[in-house]
């Protein structure tokens, strides 16, 4: 079995400029994902998909490969991760590089480690599902969620759960925004991962942080330090 890790990292992040290579506790943010992928020992190649020369330079420095430059039409705010992975697989196949399994690993997942990737891959192989992705449990019952209308009035999405006990409600999970394993065939044929053909690898909340704002970035640093207390 040949395994490929693809790390998408475009240059045009807006809320945090240069997010993928921003300083994160002394190293570029993307370096954590590259090193975890390389040190996991499960990938034959770790490949960057980027449209940005500086990001490519940083990724090469930390051991990733960059055999192509991503097209600009796959580098805007509307390009999906699935389309980026499909593009990378097709380019590599045209170069006679064929892989059985492909993992899309986000550049913004510094809280992971090599052992998590190994365990997730083992579960992916064991389950024989089309995809396996990282998820985490919602910290509050989604059945009690509400919204505000145009007059700022409160409405529950479903009032029947107003008096339900938390322990009686079905647990709900969300995408952790970290990694997605899949067969090459599934990546090329499917356009939606969140279906019964997928399985999940549940992460504890201290290993999950969606880095979209400066506040998210600072919180991720705090979590990293807590998770690696002996190193600080």
Q: Where on the chain are the PLM-derived regions?
A:
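N-terminal glycine-rich phosphate-binding loop and ensuing alpha1 helix
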Residues: 2-49
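Conserved acidic residues
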Residues: 3, 44, 65, 100, ...
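Short active-site oxyanion
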Residues: 42-47, 130, 206-207
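A conserved hydrophobic position in a structured secondary element of the catalytic/binding core
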Residues: 50, 107, 112, 181-183, ...
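Short phosphate-binding loop-to-helix
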Residues: 53-101, 111-112
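Conserved core of the sugar-phosphate nucleotidyltransferase
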Residues: 83, 101, 110-197
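Short aromatic-hydrophobic micro-motifs that form the base-stacking/packing surface
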Residues: 103-105
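Hydrophobic helical membrane-anchoring modules
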Residues: 200-202, 207-232
């Amino acid at each position: 079995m040949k395994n490929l890790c693809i790390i998408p990292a475009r240059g045009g992040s807006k809320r945090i400029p240069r997010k993928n290579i921003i300083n994160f506790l002394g190293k570029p943010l993307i370096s954590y994902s590259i090193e975890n992928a390389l040190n996991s020992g499960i990938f034959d190649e770790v490949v960057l998909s980027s449209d940005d020369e500086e990001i490519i330079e940083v990724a090469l420095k930390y051991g990733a490969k960059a055999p192509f430059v991503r097209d600009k039409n796959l580098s805007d705010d509307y390009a999906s991760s699935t389309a980026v992975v499909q593009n990378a697989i097709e380019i590599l196949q045209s170069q006679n590089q064929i892989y059985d399994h492909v993992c899309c690993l986000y550049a913004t997942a510094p809280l992971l480690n090599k052992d998590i990737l190994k365990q997730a891959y083992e579960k992916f192989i064991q389950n024989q599902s089309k995809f396996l992705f990282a998820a985490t449990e919602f910290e509050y019952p989604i059945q009690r969620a509400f919204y505000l209308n145009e007059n700022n009035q409160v409405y529950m999405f479903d009032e029947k759960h107003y008096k339900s006990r938390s322990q009686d409600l079905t647990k709900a999970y969300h995408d952790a925004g970290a990694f997605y394993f899949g067969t090459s065939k599934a990546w090329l044929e499917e356009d939606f991962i969140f279906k019964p053909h997928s399985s999940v690898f549940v992460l504890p909340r201290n290993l999950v942080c969606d880095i979209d704002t400066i506040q998210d970035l600072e919180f991720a640093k705090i979590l990293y330090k807590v998770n690696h207390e002996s190193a600080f």
